[in-house]
Amino acid sequence: MIKEHSFGIIPLRQNQGVWEVFLVQHQKGHWACPKGHPEKNETGLETAKRELFEETGLSVTRLISQIPIVEQYQFTKEGVVVDKTCTYYIAEVSGKEKLQKKEVKNGLWLTLEKAKAVVTFQEGQTVLEKVSKVIDK
């Protein structure tokens, strides 16, 4: 078993008083929030901000919560079990969407409710439910 850790931003904006989240469709077809692996000497938050900008062209305006949401799951890759941890920071973002075509096929702004129906994996739905609880406080 190998362990993997990714960091991402849950990119939010307000549109006419309603929170929306930006989801990306990866080249392999699944929908999720942007995330990636750290580079040398990078903190988790630095990784998350860099990956957000690289994949979407968006930048963090402010963190909505200082407490990240952690998602854990396992999958098999080339016959090896991967124990994956994803740490997400909830943030309000700004900028013009510019997708990194090498990794990202598509991107959409959706209400949190609609996004829960679009994300591919159950873990992603759980993460968005936690986001809803944080922003509804």
Language-model features, listed with the residues they occupy:
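C-terminal alpha-helix
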Residues: K130-K137
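NUDIX/MutT-family hydrolases
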Residues: I90-E92, E97-K130
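Residue-level signal for short segments within beta-strands and strand-turn junctions
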Residues: P11-R13, Q25, E92-V93
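Active-site segment of metal-dependent pyrophosphate-handling enzymes
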Residues: G57-K96
